[in-house]
Amino acid sequence: MTSLSCIPTRCLAVLVALALTLASSPASPAATAAPADDKKTTRKKARKRASRTVRVYVGTYTKGDSQGIYQFSFDTRTGKAGKVSLAAKTPDPSFLAIHPGGKHLLAVNETSEWDGLKNSGGISSFEIDSKTGRLNLMNQQPTRGAHPCHLVIDRSGKTVLVANYTGGSVIGYSILDDGCLGPSSSFVQHTGSGLLKPRQAAPHAHSINIDPSGQFAVAADLGMDQVLVYRFDPAKGTLLANKPAGPKVVAGAGPRHFSFHPGGRFGYVINEINLTVTAFSWNSKAGTFKEIQTISTLPPGEKQGEGMSTAELRVGVRGRFLFGSNRGHNTIVSYRIDRKTGRLTYVSNYSTGGKTPRNFGLDPSGRFLLAENQDSDTIHVLKIDRKTGKLAETGSVIQVPSPVCVRMLAIDTAK
């Protein structure tokens, strides 16, 4: 640094005079406001980027090339995806759920043995690194039933419910404040069978969901041809069988996944074996369903072919459309929802661009559907016409080994 003694006397006098002039002059409003405005504009742009960018987590089966859970960024305005990377190594994380707080992710481990315990899979809790998206393992618990295939976290974030497919049961675990899995809060073993043996010789709980009121849990059991209803106590995390127990579907239909309409008056189940969707009205006070209709997941007049089955079902972001996936047929079916009656009207079937679309995700904007082709190792991004419900190709294809579930989390880039 140059000292004052090194500055010539004439120059020093000029500098002092200039400093006194600036000190006595009133500050320019534009000059003082500009930095604040610039910061405000920067923050606004950052929030805009954050609101349109999500981090996508992909659950997989790890029998082949997959090592666990993968991640990539996704722009919900353009449909473009970022680079795919491994978020966590873990066995067969076939279904995922993001905690309401956004800091943790839970995954089932769809196995038949867990930590030396036979006839049990596992559930894992991960902490999300907000900067990198990587998942850091917190802890794990056994599910007390083989091949857990679905899970849901209640809106308070204090309980996770899991469906065990081969075990034919559902189990609940408490979630502690630090994101770790606590003690088991409930366990229910299903009993019964269905029409088609050996496929339906035993119960097979394929999904569990919580209704919009937060007071009931609904388990679709493929083996029993039944949608079972439980009273859910969010304070204790317990499940109590409702009376009546829940509706039966057509014998041999095989109910798989369930989706409530956000309005809370209707629910829909996709039937894996006979390729149909059954619509129900929902009484959220009594916890009872009444069937409205059953409709095919194939184009009108087309018959079910060998090797075909359904998989995922989701009500669209704004509650106007319902989407379902057909494996073997390798399409996504779209229906229009009558928001007064709950009835479905067929819109179209659209190719997923690959084989075996086990699952798909809808981005928060409602513009895009991400179809996971399990046997093609691809995720195809399809565009949703938000007026008609029809799908269209975007040309965006993401390579992920054995993808079977996606979950999305907003990336906060605002400072």
Protein language model features and the residues they cover:
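A short beta-strand motif characteristic of beta-propeller blades
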Residues: 82-88, 136-141, 192-198, 242-248, ...
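Blade-level signature of beta-propeller repeat domains, shared across WD40, Kelch, NHL, RCC1
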Residues: 374-415
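An edge-strand/N-cap motif at the start of beta-rich repeat modules
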Residues: 45-75
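Asp-box/WD-like beta-propeller blade repeats and closely related beta-sheet repeat scaffolds
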Residues: 133-207
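Short loop/turn segments immediately following beta-strands, especially the blade-tip
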Residues: 72-79, 126-133, 173-183, 230-239, ...
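Short glycine/acidic-enriched loop and turn motifs that connect beta-strands
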Residues: 62-65, 110-115, 166-169, 224-226, ...
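Beta-rich, blade/repeat-based domains predominating
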Residues: 65, 90-101, 144-155, 191-215, ...
